[in-house]
């Protein structure tokens, strides 16, 4: 008898394991593909320490590998940091994937977003400064389609806020509240899908 699930091997990087997942029709053939968030060394927002870069892979349901996106060292890995939305945002019948990116993120074509030489991790492993981006990727190829500055920012009009500035805005100066994210897709005008990105708990 057929099993009530699908099973196929992943191209899991050493030290990583499968974590969150989402589905969408990436190529417009009417059949879902699956996007898997692969996590290595991760930290809660309240915990010090460096993490491994978040990795995303896309597969067809027969196990065919489509692409890999590596968010790089300037995106911290943990349960609250990366919210990824898989949805047909432009109405062409193919889903895109959208998420927060940073200098050194690598798209599914191997193209670097921003400046790969930058390292914004502080001595405690937190990332509290530097540019933050929102990127929409092509769901079929993983190629970056559009990258803009992430909104809401850590601090208005300042990519390098001080600890005191962060504390005044968020209630702490190390990102425990500031760097907890949520996201959704909503039909705000009743017709077109909009990407909604949220930032900050507890404040």
Regions found by a protein language model. Give the residues of each.
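Beta-propeller-forming repeat regions
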Residues: 1-203
